[in-house]
Amino acid sequence: PDDLDFKGTKLSIAIRDKYTEYYLGEEGGDLIWAAVYKANQVVDERLHITREYVKTSESSVDHVNKVVTDILSNESTYDLVLVDQFYGCAKALDGAFANIKDEQYSKYLDLEKDYWYSDYMSNLTLSEDTLYFLGGDASPTIISWTSCTFFNWDLYDSYYGDPNALFRLVDNGGWTIDK
């Protein structure tokens, strides 16, 4: 709602130390992150909130384990947790994260808006009644770390032989960033 005002509420966000540069400033030359930073500032001003980023560690698994331990031991003051999907998803089963579809969390969220990655979020749900992870324009890491390899079938065949060998390499676990 346009008149929504959180009256200076502090939003505590757990984040890996390695990613604070993306969220804490607009400098650094990355146009996407500069836009995210500016958009977050607009939201903060409109809703009258301040973000406090709580840095944990560099390691994805250490970050998730610390955050989940804090939450499950009632030591947590986090309002939002930024985790890597690979390590974070399993922790929803441990009861560490709130179901965003519960009214107390979702009453101001319109998950039908185009800035949410609805297909991505749908793929991370356990049922139609649960949602533990959000993804959208505010966190472009979801798409910035996605990768795909395209190759010209005919050129590959001419220089390296059977293109199906590439698929077999992947299927057999031999694919690396160097190979």
Q: Which sequence ranges carry the predicted segments?
A:
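Conserved N-terminal structural module of periplasmic/extracytoplasmic solute-binding proteins
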Residues: 1-95, 157-167
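Helix-loop-helix "hinge/cap" segment bordering the ligand-binding cleft or interdomain interface
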Residues: 45, 87, 92-95, 101-179
